[in-house]
Design a protein with these regions (language model features):
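Internal, well-ordered domain-core segments that constitute the primary functional module
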Residues: 123-171
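Terminal catalytic/cofactor-binding subdomain
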Residues: 1-128, 137, 157, 167
Length: 171
């Protein structure tokens, strides 16, 4: 039970953000072969819409917020904006990929010709060689959070202690 204002404040001050990945697909349910839509902005610099491994793997990023409803509303707004700008394509809803026709059918994300852009693209090409392109099309949702007043070392200590005592905490 939370009994003090400080305890309640520590929970209401939690900062959170979401990163949601979705594959763009065509009407046949296959991976979209089109480049990242220019209407969605530059994948390298857009604060809310980027690509992950593939040109067809969109990643939606919400800003950090202490409000759960604001975070979800932002994600919904990003989805609506995206659907309005991807023509006849759809977003694949599952984490396991849609119909794939081999590694060659999975276009690696192109971030342009700047040094940073080339580095991101080369990194992704390396992942494809090391693990296979199909593995890189598995998508998901990342839930990022931080407790108010804690630095990185304190967050890592919290995680280590949770893992150490998980057998007690999760039974």
């Amino acid at each position: 039970e939370l009994t003090t204002a400080a305890q309640v404040s520590s929970l209401t001050g939690i900062q959170r953000g979401l990163e949601k990945e979705s594959l763009r697909i065509n009407n046949a349910g296959k991976l979209a072969q089109t480049p990242h839509p220019t209407e969605l902005g530059a994948a390298l610099t857009h604060p809310y819409i980027t690509t992950d491994y593939s040109e067809a793997l969109l990643e939606f990023i919400t800003p950090v917020s202490t409000s759960i409803s604001a975070t979800l509303e932002t994600l919904e707004t990003i989805h609506r904006y995206t659907y309005a700008h991807i023509d006849d394509e759809l977003l694949w809803g599952a984490s396991m990929p849609c119909i794939l026709e081999g590694d060659a059918s999975i276009p690696v994300a192109d971030y342009g010709t700047s040094n940073v852009g080339r580095a991101k693209s080369v990194y992704r090409m390396g992942l494809g060689h090391r693990y296979g392109r199909r593995m890189q099309t598995i998508s998901g949702i990342h839930y990022n959070w931080s407790l108010p007043g804690l630095n990185n070392n304190e967050h890592f200590a919290l995680i280590r202690n949770f893992r150490r005592h998980a057998f007690l905490l999760l039974t």
